[in-house]
Regions:
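N-terminal Rossmann NAD(P)H-binding glycine-rich loop of SDR-like oxidoreductase domains
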Residues: 1-9
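Conserved glycine-rich Rossmann-like NAD(P)H-binding loop of the short-chain dehydrogenase/reductase
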Residues: 10-23
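Short, conserved SAM-binding/catalytic segment
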Residues: 27-34
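Conserved Rossmann-fold cofactor-binding substructure of NAD(P)-dependent oxidoreductases
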Residues: 38-68
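ADP-ribose/adenylate-binding Rossmann-like module
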Residues: 64, 74-93
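Rossmann-fold NAD(P)-binding glycine/threonine-rich loop
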Residues: 86-108
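Conserved anion/nucleotide-ligand pocket segment
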Residues: 111-117, 121-169
Length: 169
């Protein structure tokens, strides 16, 4: 996400956040990324409050959300800050509906699962639309996608989300 924003949206005002400064510094150095950095430990309310005071949107890619996402989502809903994640934890998302009225009242928009298992297809559609515009002068109106086979493994975050979910059963 950081690499994509850095490479494609230089005019956008954004910052990178992480739980420890070393990780932030490493990512910024690796990508030659010159954006502000925010130290944000989602278990510390003061870190969340500070981050929310600096932004209009939190985009979080750090799960398990049922461990690291509760307070961030709750505070976004309370303070009118938009929230986007790539969560694949349906039980947690259902539980977070308790903040819906607060989010509506404050104007916060809550978007779950934006990118969860869809990044390959989203990128495919983006490239298809780019080619369609180049060849036909307009994007296609509808795209259908099917998966015949998959190779890959669970990421560390996916495995942690599974453990956290099973721990609640």
């Amino acid at each position: 996400v950081v690499e994509y924003l850095n490479d494609n949206y230089s005019e956008l005002k954004w910052a990178v956040a992480a739980r420890n400064q070393e990780k932030i510094d490493a990512v910024k150095a690796e990508l030659s990324c010159d954006v502000p950095a925010i130290l944000l430990d989602s278990t510390k309310m003061e870190d969340i409050e500070k981050a929310l005071s600096l932004t209009n949107l939190i985009l979080t890619t750090v799960g398990p959300y049922q461990i690291y996402g509760n307070d961030i989502l709750m505070m976004c809903a309370k303070h009118g800050v938009d929230y986007v994640d790539l969560c694949g934890e349906p039980g947690w998302m259902f539980e977070m509906q308790k903040h819906l009225a607060t989010a509506k009242e404050s104007g916060a928009r809550i978007v779950h699962s934006c990118g969860f298992d869809s990044i390959p297809s989203d990128l495919g559609v983006m490239l298809l639309q780019k080619i369609a515009k180049e060849r036909f002068g307009k994007p296609v109106e509808q795209v259908k996608c099917r998966v015949r086979s998959m190779k890959g493994e669970f990421s560390g975050g996916t495995a942690a989300s599974l453990r956290a979910t099973l721990g609640k059963l």
